[in-house]
């Protein structure tokens, strides 16, 4: 109950101090800025709730994020944009799942302590992402892919809807 009181105090302070705090635009901006972290936090919630720790989350995000433009800009994806879009979303998710499986094997099968196992990929994953990108910012343009980050449904950011949907699924799954 203490957290709810703290949240209520923060909301009340923001309402009092910030003139436009309660409008849809502010909510949309906050949702778009927080959604990625919220989605990652959902996964971490499951790890922590089960008594584990995962230091490799940021590195896994970096590897998946580095892989998406590589897949999308490949010859196959350029010749078939629909397939490229699907592959640039699904393949990085699969690679992220395989990274998690690697950590799981280290912990569950080989008996490595979770903090050590995930620290291994924390360090190596950042290196893998650097190698994949040659240390450069990767960019590409596709209206459908861009829509995931900048689009709106009913005035609310798409990534906010995705985070909300995943939150509901996780909340249902842990009940």
Enumerate the predicted regions with their spans.
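Structural signal for alpha-helical transmembrane segments and their membrane-water exit/capping regions
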Residues: 6-22, 50, 129-133, 170-175
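Interfacial loop-to-helix junctions that mark the boundaries of transmembrane helices
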Residues: 1, 24-32, 79-90, 147-161
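Transmembrane helix-bundle core of multi-pass membrane transporters
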Residues: 110, 114-175
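Single transmembrane alpha-helix segments in multi-pass membrane proteins
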Residues: 10-81, 105-115
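Hydrophobic alpha-helical transmembrane segments
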Residues: 4-5, 30, 38, 59-63, ...
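A cytosolic-side transmembrane-helix exit/cap motif
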Residues: 46-47, 78-86, 133-143
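Alpha-helical transmembrane segments within multi-pass membrane transporters and channels
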Residues: 78-122
């Amino acid at each position: 109950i203490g957290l709810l009181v703290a949240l209520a105090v923060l909301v009340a302070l923001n309402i009092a101090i910030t003139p436009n705090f309660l409008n849809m635009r502010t909510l949309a901006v906050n949702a778009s800025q927080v959604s990625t972290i919220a989605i990652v936090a959902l996964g971490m919630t499951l790890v922590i709730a089960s008594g584990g720790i995962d230091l490799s989350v940021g590195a896994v995000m970096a590897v998946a994020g580095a892989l998406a433009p590589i897949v999308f800009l490949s010859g196959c994806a350029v010749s078939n944009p629909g397939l490229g879009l699907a592959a640039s979303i699904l393949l990085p998710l699969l690679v992220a799942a395989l990274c998690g499986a690697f950590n799981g094997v280290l912990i569950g099968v080989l008996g490595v302590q979770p903090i050590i196992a995930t620290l291994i990929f924390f360090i190596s994953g950042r290196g893998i992402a650097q190698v994949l990108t040659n240390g450069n910012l990767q960019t590409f343009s596709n209206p459908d892919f861009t829509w995931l980050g900048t689009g709106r449904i009913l005035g609310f950011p798409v990534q906010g809807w995705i985070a909300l949907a995943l939150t509901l699924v996780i909340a249902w799954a842990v009940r």
